[in-house]
Swiss-Prot record:
UniProt EC number: 2.4.1.15
Residues that bind UDP-alpha-D-glucose: 21-22, 262, 267, 339, 365-369
Record flagged with keyword Cell cycle: no
Biological role: Probably involved in the osmoprotection via the biosynthesis of trehalose. Catalyzes the transfer of glucose from UDP-alpha-D-glucose (UDP-Glc) to D-glucose 6-phosphate (Glc-6-P) to form trehalose-6-phosphate. Acts with retention of the anomeric configuration of the UDP-sugar donor.
Keywords: Glycosyltransferase, Transferase
GO BP annotations listed: trehalose biosynthetic process
Similarity remark: Belongs to the glycosyltransferase 20 family.
Annotated GO MF terms: alpha,alpha-trehalose-phosphate synthase (UDP-forming) activity
UniProt protein name: Trehalose-6-phosphate synthase
Length: 473
């Protein structure tokens, strides 16, 4: 039986007691089924030459390493999060390309390949995750690794007009073709990748999803990531902590609109605040009878763009509350802090509306978690951006354009006044999709397809001559 090797920028610690996110749940499920290794950065800076830190529990080994301060800055902060992240979320105006950062990104991917190489066994299958590791298969191929290597992109893949604006776009595209299987959240993302490829080289396609580019065989497929709906339902339905129970009692005559995500410019938070203001302005009958709570803990606080959006939200929240607030009623609560995941599931359950309106998102698991947390007999309503990957599956949500504040305001009004029968029907349809496409099905489909790939032979590998692009000067 093939062993599974998972590679991601960060690894979830084996003693993690908190609620695991989607990637951790899916990866651990796959690793428990096959046995294997989870390899990645420890999240700490230090001496890169130190031996790997290894922990084994059952049939799973966690192996992690430190990054130097310089590599952390170049690979993680400057290239992954100041170039790839904004570009892949259609924000070229925020891209800060610097050649030393690109060189650091390539250097760290090569370093990771060097560290992983001694741990790889002949029949291992390798599953690589996300935008930090786009060149990783290419680095392994250079070192003679012919194992099956799959890649899953958790964030959107941009259209060629966006992607080709990146100075190393051609290098990145050819490196991606060294994976055997490329997985995307949506069909739009898969097609955007292929369109970018076609803009750079000839691509031969067989059976729709088997391709050859630069002499390299690879497959593309769509794997929308899911959640654990049963676990979320259990967390949501449990007894409320005393403070939350008291708050719920105080707000029993107020309808609650709730949002939670990390503080990021891709989430559309300023636009969301303005849409809520439009709701109060266009539908004054709701004043004093609703409350919008936005939880947005700080993320990447050292990046100027994130500092700017935090200050913008603080300003907008104060302005809206000053304009529409009344004695005894505050229309908008903005909390820039972290809350326990299990507590959030309980807040989801007693919320009347879940407001999830990113400007661009690979999937957005918060939308799925909101649905899974609801009481099926009296569910809340999901208002969801058309630019979230989840909108392709959760078609019974109220789908909105987050750039159109009046459209979002109208959807909020409809959600707040929706009859129970319609709420139940819409919720049941979405829950059915979420249960069928849960996190386990996501990883099982990907691993099954990766195992079906024909391994690359050394002869074919030599013929392909991986990473043939000229070095970026």
């Amino acid at each position: 039986m093939s062993r599974l090797v998972v590679v991601s920028n960060r690894i979830a610690p084996p003693d993690n007691k908190g609620g695991a996110g989607g990637l951790a749940v899916g990866v651990l499920g796959a690793l428990k089924a096959a046995g294997g290794l989870w390899f990645g950065w420890s999240g700490e800076t230090g001496n890169e030459d130190e031996p790997l830190k290894k922990v084994t529990k059952g049939n799973i080994t966690w192996a992690s390493f430190n990054l130097s301060e310089q590599d952390y800055e170049d690979y993680y902060c400057q290239f992954s999060n100041a170039v790839l992240w904004p570009a892949f979320h259609y924000r070229l105006d925020l891209v800060q390309f610097q050649r030393p950062a690109w060189e650091g990104y390539m250097r760290v991917n090569a370093l990771l390949a060097d560290k992983l190489l001694p741990l790889i066994k002949e029949n291992d299958i390798i599953w690589v995750h996300d935008y930090h590791l786009l060149p990783f298969a290419s680095e392994l191929r250079k070192r003679g690794v012919n194992n099956r290597i799959g890649f899953f992109l958790h964030i959107p893949f941009p259209t060629p007009e966006i992607f080709n604006a990146l100075p190393p776009h051609d290098e990145l595209l050819e490196q991606l073709c060294d994976f055997d299987l490329l997985g995307f959240q949506t069909e739009n993302d898969r097609l955007a990748f292929l369109d970018s490829l076609l803009s750079q080289t000839r691509v031969t396609t067989r059976s729709g999803k088997q391709h050859i580019a630069w002499g390299k065989d690879f497959q593309t497929e769509v794997y929308p990531i899911g959640i654990e709906p049963d676990e979320i339902a259990l967390q949501a339905a449990g007894p409320l902590p005393p403070k939350l129970a008291q708050l719920k009692a105080e707000l029993k005559n107020v309808k609650n609109i709730f949002s939670v995500e990390r503080l990021d410019y891709s989430k559309g938070l300023p636009e969301r605040f303005l849409a809520y203001e439009a709701l109060l302005e266009n539908y004054p009958q709701h004043r004093g009878k609703i409350r919008y709570t936005q939880i947005a803990p700080t993320s990447r606080g050292e990046v100027q763009a994130y500092q700017d959006i935090r200050h913008q939200l603080e300003t907008e929240a104060g302005r809206i509350n000053g304009k529409y607030g009344q004695l005894g009623w505050t229309p908008l609560y903005y909390l820039n802090q972290h809350f326990d995941r299990k507590l959030l599931m309980k807040i989801f359950r007693y919320s009347d509306v879940g407001l999830v309106t990113p400007l661009r998102d690979g999937m957005n698991l918060v939308a799925k978690e909101f649905v899974a947390a609801q009481d099926p007999a009296n569910p809340g309503v999901l208002v969801l951006s058309q630019f979230a990957g989840a909108a392709n599956e959760l078609t019974s949500a109220l789908i909105v354009n987050p750039y159109d504040r009046d459209d979002v305001a109208a959807a909020l009004n409809r959600a707040l006044t929706m009859p129970l029968a319609e709420r139940i029907s819409r919720h049941a349809e979405m829950l059915d999709v979420i249960v069928k496409n849960d996190i386990n099905r996501w990883q099982e489909r990907f691993i099954h397809d990766l195992k079906e790939v024909t391994p690359r032979s050394p002869e074919r590998q030599q013929q392909n001559n991986v990473a043939t692009f000229p070095k970026l000067a």
